[in-house]
Amino acid sequence: TTLSTSLETKQKIFAVAKELNYVKKKRVTSAPSCRIGILQWFSSKQEIEDNYYFLMRQGIEDYCSKNNISIVRTFKTDNDYQNVLSDVDGIICLGKFSKQEIKLLHSLNNKIVFLDMTVENIEITSVSLDFRQAVSDAIKYLYDLGHRTVGFIGGIEQLEDGTIFPDKRLNTFTDICDELNIKYDGFIIQDKFSTSSGYKMMSEMISKGNLPTAIFAASDHIAIGAMRALQENGYKIPEDISVMGFDNTELSGYTNPPLTTVNAPV
């Protein structure tokens, strides 16, 4: 059954409502339970280039939305980020920060959590993701497909003060390869977490004239760049060489061929 209201009927309703001084009730919404600041160490452009941190932030924001928690978001590159975070109930620092920055941020608010890095200060809560199981499953999957030489292309994160954060996936990669007797010597290259870096690293490996039978990339964006470099040089995927990504981003389903990828524990 379809119910419809004619224009004439609507006008009558509005007229009566006006006579009765009817005021439409506003939807009652409860005030936010608290206000959380999210400080990102990377720029919006970097977030687009590497979805790893985007997925983390999205998870935080989804949780806050469901639990009526207000969010204020700022970047470490913003000149006024300290002022922005001065009146929040707590802070989540997303990414990598120097010891001086950690000390400064803790002085702003002692209710603070650092996500994706380990902080030595026992008074500060930090959460570092464990990639070991995901990487182990990926390499064993390639092994079961018959691959005995596998390359690794990943990224290195570096702060302004020169502090370097190596890719945590690499140690697990070499450990599992050693366990399975998979060769990787000469097939490890690290640069940045971006599509252009993936293209650059894969091109460098191709130029050496000797390729492994499979490539494990530390992110989907790196893998997509690597796929383009391979295809431009006449290699067919997966007939000539297999490529596996990491992060399970939506973009991985739109490559040609679709990218095999690992779901990151984000």
Feature locations, PLM:
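N-terminal helix-turn-helix DNA-binding module of bacterial transcription factors
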Residues: T1-P32
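Alpha-helical recognition/docking segments in bacterial nutrient-uptake
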Residues: S33-K140, I206-S207, H221
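Periplasmic-binding protein-like
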Residues: G37, D87-L94, G151-G154, I188, ...
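Short beta-strand elements in bilobed, periplasmic/extracellular small-molecule ligand-binding domains
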Residues: C64-F75, L170, T174-S196
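Hydrophobic alpha-helical segments within soluble ligand-binding/sensing domains
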Residues: V127-I153, T195-E204, A223, V262-V266
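An alpha-beta-alpha
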Residues: A138-L180
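Flexible loop/turn connectors
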Residues: M201-V266
